From Swiss-Prot:
Encoding gene (name): TRM82
Superkingdom per UniProt: Eukaryota
WD repeats: 44-86, 134-179, 184-222
Record organism: Lodderomyces elongisporus (strain ATCC 11503 / CBS 2605 / JCM 1781 / NBRC 1676 / NRRL YB-4239) (Yeast)
The protein's name in its UniProt record: tRNA (guanine-N(7)-)-methyltransferase non-catalytic subunit TRM82
Subunit description: Forms a heterodimer with the catalytic subunit TRM8.
SMART domains: WD40 (SM00320)
Amino acid sequence: MKHPFQILTSSTDGKLLIASASSPSKESSLLLLLPELGDVLCQQNVPQPIYINYLETGPDKVLITADVDKNITIYKLENNELHQLKQQQMPKRLSGISTLNNDAIVCDSLGDVYQITIDTQPAVKKEDLKPLLGHTSPLTAVVAAQYKNPPKSFLITSDRDEHIRVSNYPKSYVIKGFLYGHTQFVSQIHLFEICKESRLVSGGGEGKLFFWDWFREVLITEFDLMPYVEEYLHEFHIKKSSKTKEEQDVQKEQEVENIQPKYEIGVQKIDSIEGEDGVFIVTLVENTSCLVVVHFTDEAKHAQTIQLAAPAVTFAIVGNKLFVSLDAENDNILTIYKFVDGQFVNDDEAQSSIAERIILANPINVEDKSKFAPFYSINQLRKRGNNYS
């Protein structure tokens, strides 16, 4: 059976769907697909055993991957083939990738951010790499932001300790400011534009979305995801206690029967699509069989909850299509929706043709679902008392 895609994303120009699947045996594949047809434009089977866990696209048909062996690999698409430009060994395992100008910007689990030039120059020794900036907590994401008036570049970083930091670029040791509001880890940050203004939406361990005017360091509004995902929660989401086993046993004896369990949720992915009257934010809460769509103008309102046939692993918006990778058996691992009049609706024609082609093109096969790679790690960022989970 086919292994689900762990990574789906759009090319920078919005013309290609990029999909990656990696099995626990470290087989990996990259597919560059035409989203309107499902045809494979280019396929890259990674020659050495490697597990790709992050992927980012850049300008000029550049593709950047990070793997669990601490490598950054930079490819360029030329004549419908991926050519490796560079592979750089990093000091620590990576936790996010962005691009700015002709540089890859990467963050790691130690809390540092590095700049890797997108060129064919030889890689340097990892010991010689110098961080652009650092947090005192493991980083979870980095995005490069451009402010138009006055024109200036910034790096926005998030970490396990509730921080979102805005730093100048390239002098990233100069901190512009922080975005305060989170009380749990921040797992996702996403830039979007509305009315020609750059905005940021973030999500993490509170189960909320936070909307920011990041340049002015102002929290615009919050949106609570829990009411829209609660019916899709299960044992995975039940809040874990930081108490000792003895304390838990005493608590169980004192509890009244039929008390509803308390849940804790984490945001796994955020993306956006423009509508006629605002921006629609699509959010995946980890290990749920739904996607929550929020309509944002100057406030955030629930627009839609998309019910899925199985838990979503990831998703991508390419043009007006929404591609969702599912943690499912029987090769039903991809479903497609189209965006029409502010709603995502089933794209039956695409499902019967495009989705089937993409699934068949996936070269990673496993014996059964028990051989799937682990998909759900966001909740491991959560603190338990004075410790992390």
